[in-house]
């Protein structure tokens, strides 16, 4: 599936000398050299060209980025469905794949996959646009590309931690802040929403880890939190199993104060999941 990113590679190679600040070595005057060629008294020695620090490469964007507003809403509600009503989700993933840098964007309902073919500076300081196309191996016309504008400043370590992006598909080209996730999407969301140990009113224990492991009175299983803003009337825990193995067991949940309520899910219509009217268990976080 990997293809050579010819456009980006050619630009990177052409600019290598400038980026590294390479300058010819200055040789000392040899005995008998023409005096006219010798440095005059008081002349300053040649200065090396300063190293460029403002150039942006695809590798600078590598990682998973999430809407800062959505992340704040997730922390406030601890419920993916409610969070998506307060702030539209947006996640961007850039990951090197052979010589290519695919860039995936999603709002958890739809996803768009394109490949980075160029990164170009814009007029304002810290502003640049990423040029994307479905094909990064062959020449493409302007009509076959998508431009996404970004703004951001690298930190002292030369790394982006936060960017503003004007997404044309999921953001109506309005700038919004996105934050780099250090531990990945699922562990971040699990940690905010549900990770922890709980007990019900009968003393039975439940636990959900950041890494996606669940332990309930009925056994252990891998879980995912449903992040799609459509097709359900409550936030849902789904057992992480192949759809080919049959319908995925699901458990609805809502936070009521500090209590985590679990619900049965009616999945007769997979595109319209419904949580029961009353909780089947009410969990209280365990101390420590």
Language model features with spans:
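Tryptophan-anchored aromatic micro-motifs
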Residues: 45-89, 169-205
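Bacterial N-terminal signal peptides
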Residues: 10-21
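Hydrophilic extracytoplasmic domains
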Residues: 230-288
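Signal peptide processing junction and immediate N-terminal pro/mature segment
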Residues: 20-37
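Short, exposed beta-strand-loop hairpins at the edges of beta-sheets
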Residues: 153, 161-171, 262-276
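N-terminal glycine/threonine-rich, aromatic-flanked beta-hairpin/loop signature
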Residues: 76-128, 200-248
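Bacterial N-terminal signal peptides that target proteins for export
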Residues: 2-12
